[in-house]
Structure formats: C-alpha cells, structure tokens
C-alpha cells in the first residue's frame, strides 16, 4: 500500500520521541514471551500474531503509558504488555462494560478480571477501565498515553456502530506525538461495509478513513501479520479459520493449512500541533 506523505517536521517528532526512550532488551522480550504466565496454547499462536515484531513496529518502550483497547476475556496481548511496561510504565486495559446488556461482553469482562486477580505479580499494576461507547469512553486520562493499541477489534466496532467513537477516544487519551497501533483482519480493497461487518474482515481504506477522521496521520504500515494463503472469502467469514474453526470438522485440515487470518498492521500518529 502506498502511504500518504507525512510532513518531515511532524514525522521527525514522532521518530525522535521513539529514539529518546529506553528500548526493551532482547533478554526482556525473550523472558516475557516464554514466561510461565503465558499458556502453551497462547504461545503457540505467536507464529500468527507475531507479538515481538508487532510491538517493536509500534515502538512500545518499557516506560510507556499504553492503553490496550478491548483485550477480550483472554487478554492475549495483555499477557505480553503488562510485564513489558510494569517497571516504569503503565498499562490501561479498556475493557467491555460489566453492566453490558450483551451477555458475551459482561462474561468476557468477568473472565478478564479473574485473570488479572489470579496473577498479581504479573497484572498487579494494570488499570482496568471501560470502553463501551457511547456510555463509556473515558479509557485513560486525556493526553497521557504514549501508545494506544488494538488487535482485531475494528470489525466489532463497525458492527456496533461505534467505530468513530472509539477512534475519537483513542485520539483524546494520546499525548501529542503518541502512536495508535492497529492490527485487523484485512478485507479486499473494494469490500463493502456490509461485507466487512458480516465477514470480520475490514479494508485498509476503511481503517485509515476512520483514523484520519479522528485526527490521526498514517505513519507506516507493515506486512508482519500478513498471510498470503488467506483469500478473505470463507463460509463463516474470518471465524472459519483458526482459532475459531466455526465449521468444526468440515474441511478442518484445509483451514488449518491456511492458518490464522491475513491482517493489516498500521501505525498512526497524533500530530504535535492539531
């Protein structure tokens, strides 16, 4: 994808902020990714979710204030982010509302809370907030976050009709020069909104439009999470593929051979001067 040109002065501010912070060491990455609090099942998905390469691409640093949007009931990325920033940074997890009318959301929130409570040495400093627009959108103090990250959630926000609210909330909490990192199942470029909502795949054009409407600049993209075996067209949408495998045993080996979905990885910046 051809990226829009970012003004040199603005881009240098984003880069300068990243280079001035202490980096996560290779030893720390290895320690976190192989830690006992990560289940074997979750670690087995590293080959598809590429947490090391993805978080390095987004520029996550140990002293960052990070907001993770909708970590879900399992908190897959929370397992990695929490220990990375625990020493001198801060992690906010903007979760589903516990008073949601949607049973899935309230159940996932309860599962996530139990996960945090069960491992205080890992998650004791994590601050749990609520993201359920339009009722809840105060996900962290305004202008305090270095990074806001979301993994495979945009299709859910589109379906709920709250995508614009979420991107606005992300913009609000970021510092000037802060980074919004988005990983999402990637649809064909010409996919309609109806197809995106039903399939779980979203076009890059759609994500970029949402981010830019909120005030963000597209800084970079990566193929870290791409999967050329995935043609984006399956009977049960993205949930046909692992780990969901919605068709059960039907064509199971076929979909296991494809692997997890083809995903975009986009990095946006909040301008220093709005």
What kind of region is each of these model predictions?
Residues 92, 177-185:
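Conserved beta-strand signature within the Rossmann-like core of class I S-adenosyl-L-methionine
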Residues 138-148:
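A short acidic, Gly/Pro-enriched loop at the edge of an enzyme's catalytic core
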Residues 82-83, 163-176:
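A short glycine-rich, Lys/Arg-flanked "PGG" loop and its adjoining helix->strand segment in the class I
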